[in-house]
Design a protein with these regions (language model features):
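A late C-terminal transmembrane helix in Major Facilitator Superfamily
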Residues: 331-363
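Helix-to-loop junctions at the C-terminal end of transmembrane segments
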Residues: 67-80, 164, 263-277, 358
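Conserved MFS/SLC helix-loop-helix module at the cytosolic interface between two early adjacent transmembrane helices
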Residues: 66-101
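C-terminal transmembrane helical hairpin of 12-TM major facilitator-type secondary transporters
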Residues: 278-317
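Helix-loop boundary and gating motifs at the non-cytosolic
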Residues: 5-62, 211-254
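Structural signature of the two symmetry-related core transmembrane helices
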Residues: 83-97, 174-177, 277-291
Length: 395
């Protein structure tokens, strides 16, 4: 096990651009995480539609966001932050000023349109975080960003659910989306740098996709997909287990403990002196997810979830770190867009895959199926790396 030292965090956090990027990223992501759960509540309660209808809306918006990732990232590389973010702000302002107050079909259309022009939050934040520090602190900085994501994921949905129980969901949805618009305006004003010292500036000649959009990059992106398959599927399976043992009121507690494990794991990974391959971390995450299928009480599920959670943020961090080192700086926006789209796709696949397994084999089957996906992808990735190294040695 590599040695752990928190000195890299002290060095990284001396960077004002890094601190700025982390704060901006958190402010912009909070409304995104809050809106995901709030849209479901709004469709089911205020619009009086089914959970299926809510799922269709979520899936449509997810596909739109996944499609937008690479081309919005490419525009970031070509034109810079402000020229990409401004249209997103205007589209979001128009769409979400109307969407909370209309019927389901119009809401669906506006959500898809807003998704296609969504602020490329993850691509911008990750580029700004990478640009803010040197090569030696990159993994630590990305780990800090992963911790910020975990905090947003834990806090934002909880606040949104609470607000939806107190006020009308239409106005809560409107308020949260306008906060997102405000965060986008702040990002536009601050305009954090997306290139580090000595790297190609935005708008310079692009590297051909044939030089980087190849097997090594795609393999890392596939690992990112498998990671979110495991996480999204586990999310559904946790809910299923808690319902099965009649402990629905403690679902939030189990999810919070799971998220706490991820937060701690992310901090520890950033403190390591040497990186660990994303494929090994994915294998560990999948292996740690299997025991969650055996849990038959809240304590057992929370404990096993905490252990699995320790590898959640590190696995995602490792895929981002490896992907960013594979591609040239002048196409990093597009690369991070592709990485984000692969992760979004994994989330969209993991939930229904686990749901299908749960319907056929019970709550524990959800964990088993998504963990198996993680094991298979990790094994394929490790095999590909071994073959590549053997081939390189032979030549």
């Amino acid at each position: 096990m590599p040695a752990v030292s928190f000195a890299p965090y002290r060095r990284a956090l001396r960077s004002k651009p890094l601190r700025t990027a982390l704060v901006l990223g958190t402010l912009v992501r909070m409304p995104v995480f809050a809106s995901t759960v709030l849209l479901t509540i709004h469709v089911v309660s205020s619009l009086d539609r089914s959970y299926t209808a809510a799922g269709v809306l979520a899936a449509a918006a997810t596909v739109a966001i996944a499609v937008s990732g690479p081309w919005r990232g490419r525009l970031l590389d070509r034109y810079g932050l402000r020229r990409v973010v401004l249209p997103s702000i205007l589209v979001a302002l128009v769409c979400w000023s109307i969407a909370p107050f209309v019927d389901y079909l119009l809401l669906l259309g506006l959500a898809v349109l807003a998704g296609l022009f969504v602020i490329p939050t993850f691509s911008i934040t990750r580029q700004a975080v990478i640009a803010a520090v040197g090569e030696e602190e990159r993994r630590t900085a990305i780990s800090l960003d992963a911790v910020a994501v975990e905090l947003s994921f834990i806090v934002a949905p909880a606040v949104a659910v609470w607000a939806a129980t107190v006020w009308d969901t239409s106005w809560v949805l409107f308020t949260i989306q306008m906060l997102g618009v405000g965060a986008g305006i702040l990002m536009y004003v601050v305009d954090p740098p997306l290139r580090g010292e000595g790297e190609a500036v935005v708008g310079t000649a692009r590297a051909s996709s044939r030089t980087w959009f190849r097997l090594p990059f795609l393999a890392v992106c596939l690992a990112a997909t498998a990671t979110t398959v495991v996480l999204a599927g586990s999310d559904i399976a946790i809910i299923a287990v808690m319902r099965d043992i009649a402990a629905e009121g403690q679902i939030g507690l189990v999810l919070a403990v799971w998220g706490l494990g991820s937060l701690i794991g992310g901090l520890l990974y950033g403190a390591l002196h040497r990186p660990i391959s994303a494929f090994w971390l994915l294998a560990g995450l999948a292996a740690a997810t299997f025991p969650m299928a055996l849990a038959s009480s809240t304590v057992q599920l929370a404990a096993s979830g905490f252990v699995a959670g320790l590898l959640c943020a590190p696995t995602i961090t490792a895929t981002i770190d490896q992907a960013s080192r594979i591609v040239p700086a002048q196409v990093r926006g597009e690369a991070m867009g592709w990485h984000g789209s692969f992760m979004t796709t994994g989330g969209a696949v993991g939930a229904p895959l686990a749901g299908l397994a749960i319907d056929r084999g019970g709550p524990g089957a959800g964990f088993v199926v998504v963990a198996a996906v993680g094991v298979v992808v990790a094994a394929l990735g490790l095999t590909a790396v071994s073959v590549r190294r053997a081939t390189a040695s032979a030549t």
